[in-house]
Every structure is written in structure tokens, then in C-alpha cells.
Amino acid sequence: MTLLGRLHLLRVLGTPPVFLLGLLLALPLGAQGLSGVRFSAARTAHPLPQKHLTHGILKPAAHLVGYPSKQNSLLWRASTDRAFLRHGFSLSNNSLLIPTSGLYFVYSQVVFSGESCSPRAIPTPIYLAHEVQLFSSQYPFHVPLLSAQKSVYPGLQGPWVRSMYQGAVFLLSKGDQLSTHTDGISHLHFSPSSVFFGAFAL
């Protein structure tokens, strides 16, 4: 006799409905004819997408620290303090070489400082400037990407300090070169947290 026939017989014989409900709950899902429910539940339990289980690809990044040279020029170093070159970036002839084409955030900071003017001296303005330049096969010359200028008039009130920070996003090509040009190098305040230059892929 089928399951439905047995239940009908029990009901005819006066079996309480509560007992029948308990009997149904006690039966396995397959015996209740509800196997489809079990399979539906299994289908909804999807695993997490693969992209959430794996780490992203590490992108190119570089951070350089400035230091003075005997030629009164600003040189960049990648092997000291908190400086680094990662995932394809390289430093050649004081220029950063772009490893792959794409969008990059390029940034640089310089800090200038100086003493106050002597009471007998005639104050003269000091011109300060810092520029990040691009040299590419598409252009026969250095193209300014970031540029900042300031003029300082030393007074009698004491030492002075001026800082310049610049940063923006650029579309660069593999093999492009990033370099800097600075006016007022003799007034640069060299420290890892004051004079730096870098870029990272987005």
C-alpha cells in the first residue's frame, strides 16, 4: 500500500490529525515526496565568487627619496630609508621608467628652508620651483606634468620654510621616463619625509 493510502486508512480509523503531522515530520524528506525541496536548497548555496577568494595582482609602485650631490643637483635614491621600487619600476639616469602602459598617480614633494636676511643686506627674492617632467618616444623633449613655483623674500623675522606638494593621475606608456627639475636646490631641506618622488599604477 502506498504512503497516501496508509494515511487515508489511519484517518478513516480515527487517528488524530496531530499524530499524522508528527508522522510526516518524522519521515525522511525523500519518503515525504519532498526531495525536490532538498535539491533546490542545495542549488541556492552557491560558493563565493573566485575573485573574492584570491588576492589581487600586485601593481607597479615606486617611492624615491632625494639627496644632494656634489654638482648641486637633486638625485633620487631607491635603496635607503623608506624608498623602494616594486613590480617592474626601475631607476635609470635619475629617471623613473614606466614598466607597463596604464593610469598612474604621480606625486612629488620638496621642502625649502633658509635663514633670515642680515639687517645690512638688501633683501632679494629667492625663486623656488619644482617640476615633474615626462620624456616619451612621442615627444622629442621633456614635457612638464606637474609644476609649482614660489618666491621668498627673506626678512629679519627669522628662518623661513616653504613646501610644495604635487600629485595627479596620468595615462602613461611603457618605456616613458619621469624625472624632475628643481630651482633653489641649495635651499632644499633634505630628509625622507620632506623630499620625495614616486608613482604607482591604478
UniProtKB/Swiss-Prot annotation:
Signal peptide: 1-33
InterPro entries reported for this sequence: TNF, TNF_beta, TNF_CS, TNF_dom, Tumour_necrosis_fac-like_dom
PROSITE patterns documented for this protein: THD_1, THD_2
SUPFAM superfamilies: TNF-like (SSF49842)
Gene3D superfamilies: 2.60.120.40
Coiled-coil features, chain-numbered ranges: none
Domain THD: 60-202
One of the GO BP terms on file: positive regulation of chronic inflammatory response to antigenic stimulus
PANTHER family: LYMPHOTOXIN-ALPHA, TUMOR NECROSIS FACTOR FAMILY MEMBER
Family, per entry: Belongs to the tumor necrosis factor family.
Stated name of the protein: Lymphotoxin-alpha
Organism expressing this protein natively: Mus musculus (Mouse)
